[in-house]
Amino acid sequence: MGDIAKGKKIFVQRCSQCHTVTKEGRHKVGPNLWGLFGRKTGQAEGYSYTQANIEKGITWDEETLNVYLQNPKKYIPGTKMNFAGIRKKRERLDIIAYIKEATSK
């Protein structure tokens, strides 16, 4: 498991421009991530996903999010997430720990 505090710092630097994590958070360029864990791809209510995201059909958990964050466009070709990915596994695990904690309060 990752470090939540480190994950929050990385999230603020690299993810918060496009995503929110609170229950009342709005969609930005990317969807609000509240309730992400256990949800299928392309299912955040009120967000306009690409067909590729909708059809991927995986359920978000630590493992799938880790693979996705390493290289989003490779994992879901056709995603509109304009982000190259996070190479360092430790950073991905920290972000995942933060997202899991922040989106389940």
Curated annotation (Swiss-Prot):
Q: Which SUPFAM superfamilies match?
A: Cytochrome c
Q: Which InterPro entries match?
A: Cyt_c-like_dom (IPR009056), Cyt_c-like_dom_sf (IPR036909), Cyt_c_1A/1B (IPR002327)
| Modifications the protein undergoes after translation, according to the UniProt entry | Binds 1 heme c group covalently per subunit.
Q: Which domain of life is it from?
A: Eukaryota
Q: Where is the protein situated, by its record's location annotation?
A: Mitochondrion intermembrane space
Q: Which GO terms label this protein's molecular function in UniProt? A: electron transfer activity; heme binding; metal ion binding
- The coiled-coil regions, if any, are none
List keywords of the entry alphabetically: Electron transport, Heme, Iron, Metal-binding, Mitochondrion, Respiratory chain, Transport
Major subcellular location class: mitochondrion
Q: Which residues bind heme c?
A: C15, C18, H19, M81
Show the GO cellular component annotation of the record: mitochondrial intermembrane space
Family note: Belongs to the cytochrome c family.
Q: What does this protein do?
A: Electron carrier protein. The oxidized form of the cytochrome c heme group can accept an electron from the heme group of the cytochrome c1 subunit of cytochrome reductase. Cytochrome c then transfers this electron to the cytochrome oxidase complex, the final protein carrier in the mitochondrial electron-transport chain.
Q: What is this protein called?
A: Cytochrome c-a
UniProt source species: Takifugu rubripes
Which lineage?
A: Eukaryota, Metazoa, Chordata, Craniata, Vertebrata
Q: Which gene encodes it?
A: cyc-a
